[in-house]
Amino acid sequence: MKIYIQPLSVNSHTVEVLANSLPKIFNAEVFVLPASDVSLKCYNASRRQYNSTCILRMLPPIKVTLGVTGKDIYAKGMNFVFGEAELGGARAVLSVFRLTTADSELYRERVVKEAVHEIGHVLGLKHCSNNCVMRFSNSVQDVDRKPVSFCRECASKIRY
């Protein structure tokens, strides 16, 4: 499997964390695409956030492409999201905006968990109620409580 990371207005340290972590988790080759900025077409000035669906649609439709941004993002009907993905599709987007903390190890864990979660959606997984990386996170505390790994049930359903 190949994973393409598309940096979108995000620091290089975050990209490096993912480029070093994802190959081990998914037994995948990881390629970092040239960095670019999030399109202003996706910006909602009244919310001061970027629309995650708009960003998702601007990513190359190559399975698996993970857009990673430092911008705050939202989806329709939500105050914010950590990410959005095409279920069983090719693309996902992850925002690290609300994952930031002074604790560098905790930041790394959060970023990796949410990247694995979004890639899990691309690989066909829905949200899970088990103690699993696919558990829905409504807050950063929810992210901190879940593991970085898939439960057995989810691991058996992954469609590479």
UniProtKB/Swiss-Prot annotation:
Cofactor: Zn(2+)
Entry protein name: Archaemetzincin
Signal sequence bounds: none
GO molecular function: metallopeptidase activity; zinc ion binding
Cofactor mode of binding and number, as noted: Binds 2 Zn(2+) ions per subunit. One is catalytic, whereas the other seems to have a structural role.
Gene: amzA
Active site: E118
Any one Gene Ontology BP term: proteolysis
UniProt source species: Archaeoglobus fulgidus (strain ATCC 49558 / DSM 4304 / JCM 9628 / NBRC 100126 / VC-16)
EC number from the UniProt entry: 3.4.-.-
Family of the protein in this entry: Belongs to the peptidase M54 family.
Pfam family, one: Peptidase_M54
Residues bound to Zn(2+) 1: H117, H121, H127
Amino-acid positions noted as binding Zn(2+) 2 in the UniProt annotation, renumbered to this chain: C128, C132, C151, C154
Gene3D superfamilies: Collagenase (Catalytic Domain)
Alphabetical UniProt keywords: Hydrolase, Metal-binding, Metalloprotease, Protease, Zinc
Subunit structure: Monomer.
Function: Probable zinc metalloprotease whose natural substrate is unknown.
